[in-house]
Amino acid sequence: MLRAGALLGGLGAAGALVGCGDDGSSAGGSTTTAAGGGATTGALIASFPQSTPYIAAGSPARLPYLIADREGVPLRSIDGPVRFTVSRDGTPVGEPVEVTPRSDGVPRAYLPLAFTFADPGIYDVSAEYGGSTLEGSVQVVDRSKITTPMVGDRLPAVASPTTANAMGVDPLCSRDPVCPYHSVSLDAAVASGKPAILVVSTPAFCQTAVCGPLLDHVMEAVGEPGGINVIHSEVYANPTAVDDLAKATVAPVPKAFDMAFEPALFVADASGVVVSRGDIIVDRGELAEMLAPIR
């Protein structure tokens, strides 16, 4: 069973960026090597879960990376595009990928690497930036080890808290003022035959400096939903009743999805199939691209 603490601990490097807007950071095991072989400043930071199964073999992965300065603080702007190379046992896998930095409306600039890893195993990921090679590694697991819905999966038809039935979640929405996305339950939305947008986030209790205003961006982008069901699910059921969020009860949707991270965006088409997913950090431009398939 998912514990509330896992929502913080599963982020690896990103989880070390405690407190929204905090400038503290950790490179989380990533290393930095100059092109000539000597040490240099900066590091590649994986802003996605590292200590829990997250990347599935054979499924498209979106891996947001940050670049840190010499003090380990993530850069607010990144010159790009940045070239990424994926390798295994010293052998490149596929072609290098040029990644455009994103930073519109988020606390830190980031690089969303899109890559499909064919097989389970440990892969090396490197990025060329400022004349240096920034290196890290990722673990890819068999698809069966991941239960959170991925692109191509059906969005699970589970009940979510609403204004009519809060299901024990208090507050129902921690945004101030509250958002308008708590009138329809997720199971009803999936069965409606309409596209759906699901945001799992806790605006008032964000625990990383990169979580960003995802819910606000969705509100800004969607406006009047019209023929689209938009649902916001809080992460914790009782955050104000505990003195430590690690002791809080996980809310119904992230518990049902077995999520070890937040925030997250799931975009499903009219048939209920997930067509886009954005975890941890999503800027305005990338959000527009994720919503495009249902607009």
Sequence positions of predicted segments:
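N-terminal export signals
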Residues: 1-21
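Bacterial lipoprotein signal-peptidase II cleavage site
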Residues: 19-30
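Contiguous segments within soluble domain cores/interaction surfaces
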Residues: 35-122, 126-171
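Short active-site neighborhood of thiol/selenol oxidoreductases, capturing the structured segment around
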Residues: 191-205
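Typically the conserved alpha-helix immediately C-terminal to a functionally engaged Cys/Sec
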Residues: 208-223
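Thioredoxin-like thiol-disulfide oxidoreductase module
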Residues: 235-261
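A short, hydrophobic beta-strand/beta-hairpin element that forms part of a small beta-sheet core
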Residues: 263-276
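Non-catalytic, surface beta->alpha helical segment in thiol-disulfide oxidoreductase systems
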Residues: 274-295
